[in-house]
A protein has these predicted regions:
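A short glycine-rich beta-alpha junction/loop motif
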Residues: 18-22, 101, 115-120, 155-179, ...
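Non-catalytic DNA-recognition/assembly elements of restriction-modification systems
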Residues: 19-49, 170, 178, 223-246
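Residue-level recognition of short, solvent-exposed, well-ordered loop/turn junctions
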Residues: 34, 71, 77, 83, ...
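Short, solvent-exposed loop/turn positions at domain surfaces
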Residues: 23, 79-82, 157, 190, ...
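A short beta-sheet element
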Residues: 84-145, 164, 282-343, 356-357, ...
């Protein structure tokens, strides 16, 4: 009887051994899969560099989470000093022993020949065609593989948690026949390329939107049908400070995220981190704005976000909150204006350089509300916001598509690297 994927999964979950499988210490595996020590499959490769002071050398680095190799700026041998470095050999498994527990692994190629790597980046070449490097990298990104890297990296977090190479090579790994390894690796590599192409498309859409923002929100480019004068308005003329406290016991605690805006804190951090007493928090309604005065990536002078996800929520009293005056400005336009960073130069002008309290910019409320904002007519604001919102929707759909492709890859890894689904050779 030929079993389907669901039948195999159900049998394995019940502890039964399906036809064509066997029970091992590593779990239930296909009958032709074996368990090997890594030392039986890999051999260390090293060729020391005789560093010459006047020569230029390009060093590699290894990103965490299986993101692979990157190149550093060339340096002279004199700048390397007494560092112990090695020539990069092609077609090897390479690992950063300091961050192996974070899956800082990769595969060397012909592109890296002539470059050098730290003594902390040991390289290994397959022995007797027992293991495919691409398969091995995918394996180390699974739960079973990361467990091996962590177990071989004892100690505390950070630089004290270093991979013990002897322990690493004594670790046991599950391997299908080499041809099946290569086929599995090819399938996963194809899926990686799908993700990579869509991520490039997303980056291009984001660049296009940024260009549109810079053109439309400054009046450099006008939409058809609009030619009216733009005027500078102070924030206090179009919005009022919002300080309503949470007297109703609302528990939807919000935080500001660069990508998601005002989002539920527990959802964003996967845990509740706010204090128990939330009565002094500000109570926001949909459409209200909040300004986080702390620096974050991409927001050197803090981020201003609009509440769009929920009807109501609460934020820390450290935020500056405000509500637009009805009929004075488009909330959607203002949201795009702040996202473009066009308020930053205003904040920079009155924020004291280096004056931060617990990471927060020292900003006076009056100064903040005296900030100037360039505004066209309400009709043109609405039209601009519609164009930029349409671009946002395209970007969000692409993000969702990419996330689905990543989930698809996870499912493929779970099925292919455990032998639940077999590939045809």
């Amino acid at each position: 009887m030929i079993l389907g994927t669901r039948d195999i999964i159900e049998q394995i979950q019940r502890g039964n051994v399906p036809d064509g499988y066997k029970k091992t210490k590593a779990g239930i595996l296909p009958a032709d899969w074996d368990v090997h020590m890594l030392g039986e499959c890999l051999s260390r490769v090293e060729r020391p560099v005789e560093v010459k002071p006047n020569e230029l050398y390009t060093q590699i680095g290894i990103r965490s989470h299986g993101k692979g190799i990157f190149y550093k700026e060339p340096v002279t041998g004199a700048a390397l000093g007494n560092k112990s470095v090695f020539w990069i050999e092609p077609d090897c498994f390479i690992v950063n022993i300091v961050f192996a527990w974070e899956q800082a692994i990769g595969k060397t190629t012909q592109s890296e020949v002539g470059m050098i790597g730290s003594h902390r980046f040991p390289m290994y070449r397959p022995v007797n065609d027992r293991v495919d490097i691409d398969y091995l990298i995918s394996y180390f990104l699974t739960k079973r593989g990361t467990d091996i890297l962590e177990a071989a990296s004892p100690g505390g977090a950070g630089r004290n948690k270093t991979l013990g190479q002897e322990r690493f090579l004594k670790s046991k790994i599950v391997l299908p026949p080499i041809e099946e390894q290569k086929k599995i690796a090819a399938i996963l590599t194809t899926q990686d390329r799908v993700i990579e192409l869509k991520e490039k498309r997303l980056a291009e859409k984001q660049r296009q939107k940024k260009y549109l923002m810079q053109q439309l929100l400054t009046g450099k480019k006008r939409l058809p049908g609009f030619s009216g004068e733009w005027k500078a308005n102070r924030l206090r003329n179009i919005a009022t400070r919002h300080t309503k406290r949470n007297t109703i016991g609302n528990t939807n605690v919000l935080t500001i995220s660069a990508q998601y805006g005002l989002i539920n804190q527990a959802e964003f951090f996967n845990k509740a981190v706010a204090s128990d007493d939330k009565s002094n928090y500000f109570l926001l309604e949909k459409g209200d704005f909040a300004y986080n005065k702390s620096y974050s990536n991409g927001y050197p002078f803090g981020a201003i976000k609009r509440l769009t996800r929920y009807e109501v929520g609460i934020v820390s009293p450290l935020y500056i909150c405000f509500r637009i005056k009805e009929g004075s400005v488009s909330g959607e336009y203002l949201e795009q204006y702040f996202e473009a960073g066009l308020m930053s130069h205003e904040i920079q002008a009155f924020a004291q350089e280096g004056a931060r309290n617990h990471g927060l910019l020292n900003i006076a409320i009056d100064d903040f509300f005296n900030s100037k904002i360039l505004l066209p007519s309400l009709e043109e604001q609405t039209a601009i916001a519609e164009v930029l919102s349409a671009a946002d929707r395209e970007i969000e759909l692409l993000r969702q598509d990419i996330e689905q492709e990543k989930q698809k890859k996870k499912a493929l890894m779970q099925l292919l690297l455990t032998g639940i689904v077999r590939v045809k050779i």
